[in-house]
């Protein structure tokens, strides 16, 4: 099922409770110009505000995930300190505050610069075995400004992150898996996309939406405000969840030995 949102460079497909978002400039290796940044921002905005959507999947059309920024088009906007994101969108690098919907990303081919940062902003990442990664900003006189300087050291460890951030060298899917940039490696692009969709549906179709949101919120709070702040919220949040219809349904479905039918209430 398609969705009525006027986007030119990003495709949208609703698959049950999952929104599949596809980078759609394959003729340019999915390099991000201003239009594509705005389109992906609006797609992420839709994912967050549509209560019927419980998870998102980010994929790319063509042979490559992304060649990074189209610097000739985007550089003037970035250099002027202007935001490329519309009012009804969200920051695709997820630097604009808490998010309530989990995101699974599938990558193939070349994944450069902001592509790596899109992966780091996702909750689960799957790659095809042919993928090649590089954070090449330092080779262009700038530096990664979409979160890699913060997230890659945190996720991969300082040495692993600096090995690639400071040199701009290319690395393969096996190395991406070793350092924790991706969680799974599949045979090819089709398998990566299928696995990402499978994981998203495991979340959207089986897990209670309120439980998923509370889990994300707790983990995000620990990262942004520290463990003590997250620990302080554990008991109050579980008390709140025990009072929901979904918690009652979780117990009842267990007693009746049937799949739970969660409503997000």
Over which residues does each language-model region extend?
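CoA-thioester-processing core
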Residues: 92-98, 106, 112-165, 195-199
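An acidic, glycine-rich surface segment that forms the CoA-thioester-binding/catalytic face
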Residues: 37-41, 45, 71-111, 150
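C-terminal long alpha-helix characteristic of the crotonase
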Residues: 26, 126-131, 182-232, 245, ...
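Acidic, divalent-metal-coordinating active-site segment for phosphoryl/phosphodiester hydrolysis
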Residues: 113, 169-175
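Conserved CoA-thioester-binding segment of acyl-CoA-metabolizing enzymes
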Residues: 1-61
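A general structural signal for well-ordered alpha-helical segments in protein cores
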Residues: 71, 149, 158-161, 193, ...
């Amino acid at each position: 099922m398609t969705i009525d949102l006027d986007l030119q460079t990003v495709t949208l497909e609703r698959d049950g409770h999952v929104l599949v978002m596809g980078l759609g400039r394959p003729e340019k290796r999915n390099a991000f110009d201003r239009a594509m940044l705005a389109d992906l921002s609006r797609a992420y905005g839709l994912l967050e505000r549509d209560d019927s959507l419980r998870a998102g999947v980010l994929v790319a059309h063509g042979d490559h995930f992304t060649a990074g920024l189209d610097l000739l088009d985007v550089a003037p906007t970035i250099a002027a300190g202007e935001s490329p994101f519309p009012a009804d969108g969200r920051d695709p690098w997820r630097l604009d505050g808490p998010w309530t919907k989990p995101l699974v990303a599938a990558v193939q081919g070349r994944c450069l610069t902001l592509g790596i940062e899109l992966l780091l902003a996702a909750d689960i990442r799957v790659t095809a075995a042919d993928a090649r990664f590089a954070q090449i900003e330092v080779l262009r006189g700038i530096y990664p400004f979409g979160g890699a300087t913060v997230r890659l050291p945190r996720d991969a460890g300082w040495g692993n992150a600096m090995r690639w951030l400071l040199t701009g060298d290319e690395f393969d899917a096996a190395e991406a898996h070793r350092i924790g940039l991706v969680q799974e490696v599949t045979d090819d692009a089709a398998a990566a996309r299928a696995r990402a969709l499978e994981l998203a549906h495991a979340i959207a179709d089986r897990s209670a939406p309120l439980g998923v949101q509370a889990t994300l919120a707790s983990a995000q709070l620990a990262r942004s405000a520290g463990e003590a702040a997250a620990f302080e919220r554990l008991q109050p949040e579980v008390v709140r969840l025990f009072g929901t219809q979904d918690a009652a349904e979780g117990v009842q479905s267990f007693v009746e030995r049937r799949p739970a039918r969660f409503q997000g209430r």
